[in-house]
Amino acid sequence: ALSVVYPTEEDTAVYGPLAQMDYETWNKWVEFVGKKGGYGSDLAANGTVKNQEELDNIIGKYAYGYNVVAGRVNYRDEIKLANGGAAGGYVGSMQTGTITNGQAYQAKTIKGLRCAGGFAGEMINGGAAKLGGVDILGLNLQLGQMLQVLNVFVPVIKKSSVEGYQSGLIVQSEGVDNKNICGYAGGYVGKLIGGQIWGENDARCKVTKLRRVDGRSYVGGFVGSSRPGSVATLNPTAGEGLLSQLLNKLLSTPADLIKVLNATVATIRYADVEAWDDWGIIVNGAYASGSNNTSYAKAAGGFAGNLEGTVLGKKDTEKAGVSVQNIRSVVAGEYAGGCFGVADVAGVANISAGNETSLLDKLLKLGRTDVLDAFRSYVYYGTVSGSKDAGL
């Protein structure tokens, strides 16, 4: 029943205005609309064309990319409003589903209050605890069924990329609040919780022609913040707490719990960040505050601002690694790095927000130190290069 409502998209793309215009349609427009003056008269002055190449040369002078803006300017902690303020070049907020070979071209400026990303504003393994009239938390599921339920709520992006406009893609998340809910910005995705981003050797997940990323909490050239789906420090108002509730049912069976935890780890493979120009990419966490002082985001990195329980690349598979090219500068208040600002495990120690059950303590008392692997972050075959013009 869950799979019935599982959204999937394959082989789709987003373009800026005038892109993909074919020359036959162009000629008809010139003949019946453009030559009569008024709207588009400067375009129509080019006249009809004989082939697609001629048209592409004309449109290349006028194609101006597209902007995405999530318009809310103030955050409000209410169910109807908590999910607003997420902007992405392809998708704003992705709470489940799979996107395969989705492409975004000519993205110019992506701006959101809570989070912004060149491809996706946020990827969250969320969804309602009650779906289709079935109370998932009340079901008596075997482990295999439980894993299937978890997978339904894990968002996956495969072989999908975003290409910036010719003058470079700018990603901005300038919301400020006192709970670190706003201000997540990444060249590809702003906020990632338990999601999977998987490219392939011949179809990597890339953000190209990136110029700058600005955020006020966590900022990264590829991802602002990446965390596992088992974290307890989620925002239940925004529907982020389902997996923690499911995992809480398994606290008494550590062996099963470890398998489920591994299913919630965020993974990014075959992923790249490329600059718009040799001038390089700026990852910026500095901003002017109301008191005319300079304030800073907590963490920023050339690839990721914050990593928790995340695996970048793939063990023993060099080509599955991640790369950042042409980073010019990375600025943050507490943590800044060429690859990542901070990689931490603290956020996943408590799984039950109600009574603060310490999952880590419970498992360590049982001698299950192997569970620590589900909490650590790993980087396999990651590379960073500075700006060709000015270095890093």
Pin down the residues of each PLM region:
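Surface-exposed loop/turn motifs in large extracellular/passenger domains
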Residues: 1-392
